[in-house]
């Protein structure tokens, strides 16, 4: 039993006994004894059945203090339990911080590295990108082999689809989603790149979101505007990448990015709605960037790489994936 409950129970018993003793000093011992009080509904008190040889008596002090003893103990016990129940709910509703890895390279050694990192216990979501989206013909034998390998290692995969900030035809976006769903078995959702942050495009992304959710097993719908979007996007995504830039910019513009962090009361609920990707970051700065992403910006999915900005940022994995996996795993 929790020590807090034990202390409160002892306190309730002692105080209740003192109250009952105090009430007994006002009780007339020469009168006929009464039956034990019965708790009544709504009043919180009790009443006694008098001895048949005596007329009914009202306002007898002793039973009042006895009833007070019972109810005092009851409410203190409830107060003792309430905070513990809250903590229990908070603990069981938490999720692990995960790595969000842009795996834009052809299956091979890099995929092996991701599988090995997952075996250490860190949770990983890998974004696969066969051809700036799905290959219309579906995965070749190498993709099939390595997708199975990642699944066996516990990695969740999502398919890359670009949206051109809402300018790409929604039918083309949904067609890519259909191709992934029909030809790339085992995926857990879609990563929507070049996503808009404007409220004017919410209808567009609602259409896409509903299409993603119609696919069996597609639990992830990740948007990548790379900045803080309109709040309406929270309802039509599982995660939103609110930072994609050089890690030094997260540090240099720390004050401006703090505004993206939810308030303390909201942080628990929004934690898994935010994601961050930092490139051009040395191994020595990696841990500090991750800690800022998680503790300040309440991000649930993170990735830091030493890949430089440009067309080929994610054509290779970060050189310190193993250390990064350990750093993220240690946060859970």
Swiss-Prot record:
Keywords: Signal. Residues 1-22 form the signal peptide. Residues 26-60 are annotated as: Disordered. InterPro entries: Spherulin4. The keyword Signal applies. The keyword Signal applies. This is Spherulin-4.
């Amino acid at each position: 039993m929790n020590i807090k409950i034990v202390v409160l129970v002892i306190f309730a018993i002692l105080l209740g006994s003192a109250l009952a003793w105090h009430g007994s000093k006002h009780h007339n011992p020469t009168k006929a004894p009464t039956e034990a009080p019965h708790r009544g509904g709504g009043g919180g008190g009790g009443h006694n059945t008098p001895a048949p040889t005596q007329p009914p008596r009202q306002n007898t002090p002793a039973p009042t203090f006895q009833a007070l003893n019972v109810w005092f103990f009851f409410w203190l016990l409830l107060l003792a339990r309430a905070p513990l129940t809250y903590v229990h709910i908070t603990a069981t509703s938490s999720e692990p911080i995960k790595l969000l890895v842009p795996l834009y390279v052809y299956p091979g050694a890099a995929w092996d590295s991701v599988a090995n990192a997952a075996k250490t216990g860190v949770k990983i979501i890998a974004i696969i990108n066969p051809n700036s989206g799905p290959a219309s013909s579906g995965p070749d034998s190498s993709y099939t082999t390595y997708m199975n390998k990642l699944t066996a290692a516990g990695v969740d995969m999502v398919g890359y689809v670009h949206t051109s900030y809402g300018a790409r035809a929604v039918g083309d976006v949904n067609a890519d989603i259909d191709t992934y769903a029909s030809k790339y078995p085992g995926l857990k959702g879609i990563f929507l790149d070049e996503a808009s942050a404007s409220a004017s495009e919410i209808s567009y992304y609602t259409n896409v979101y509903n299409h993603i959710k119609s696919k069996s097993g597609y639990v992830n719908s990740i948007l990548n505007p790379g900045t803080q979007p309109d709040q309406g996007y929270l309802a039509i995504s599982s995660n939103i990448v609110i930072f994609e830039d050089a890690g030094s910019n997260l540090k240099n513009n720390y004050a401006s990015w703090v505004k993206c962090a939810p308030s303390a009361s909201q942080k628990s609920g929004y934690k898994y709605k935010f994601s961050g990707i930092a490139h051009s970051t040395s191994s020595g700065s990696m841990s500090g960037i991750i800690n800022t992403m998680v503790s300040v910006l309440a991000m649930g999915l993170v990735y830091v790489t030493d890949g430089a900005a440009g067309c080929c940022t994610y054509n290779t994995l970060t050189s310190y994936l193993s250390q990064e996996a350990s750093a993220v795993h240690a946060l859970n």
